[in-house]
Amino acid sequence: MAVEKVNSSSSLAEVIDRILDKGIVIDAWVRVSLVGIELLSIEARIVIASVETYLRYAEAVGLTSQAAVPSAA
């Protein structure tokens, strides 16, 4: 996949359309500690994409298989 460089300005709608088409993943990790004692730890992975894009890439890495779905029991 080649990176395309465009020198023209983009409208907000074009930027949102491109993000939904290609998708974006944000990994966040926060740890709050006081005097060496961990008080709070937060890990998050945020995926922003259209449903079609998410399903296309999730299927490629095996996230849509039945094994990836947690059981209700």
UniProtKB/Swiss-Prot annotation:
Query: Looking at the keywords, is Cell inner membrane present?
Result: no
One example of the protein's molecular function in GO is: structural molecule activity
InterPro entries from the UniProt entry: Gas-vesicle_GvpA-like (IPR000638), Gas_vesicle_GvpA (IPR047870), GvpA (IPR050530), GvpA-like_CS (IPR018493)
One cellular component term from this protein's GO annotations in UniProt: vesicle membrane
Q: Quote the PROSITE patterns the UniProt record gives.
A: GAS_VESICLE_A_1, GAS_VESICLE_A_2
Mention any Pfam family matching this sequence: Gas_vesicle
Localisation per UniProt entry: Gas vesicle shell
Specify the superkingdom: Bacteria
Supply the alphabetized keyword list. Gas vesicle
Q: Tell me the function of this protein.
A: Gas vesicles are hollow, gas filled proteinaceous nanostructures found in some microorganisms. During planktonic growth they allow positioning of the organism at a favorable depth for light or nutrient acquisition. GvpA forms the protein shell.
Q: How does it assemble?
A: The gas vesicle shell is 2 nm thick and consists of a single layer of this protein. It forms helical ribs nearly perpendicular to the long axis of the vesicle.
User: What protein family is recorded?
Assistant: Belongs to the gas vesicle GvpA family.
Name of the protein in question = Gas vesicle protein A
Organism whose genome encodes this protein? Nostoc punctiforme (strain ATCC 29133 / PCC 73102)
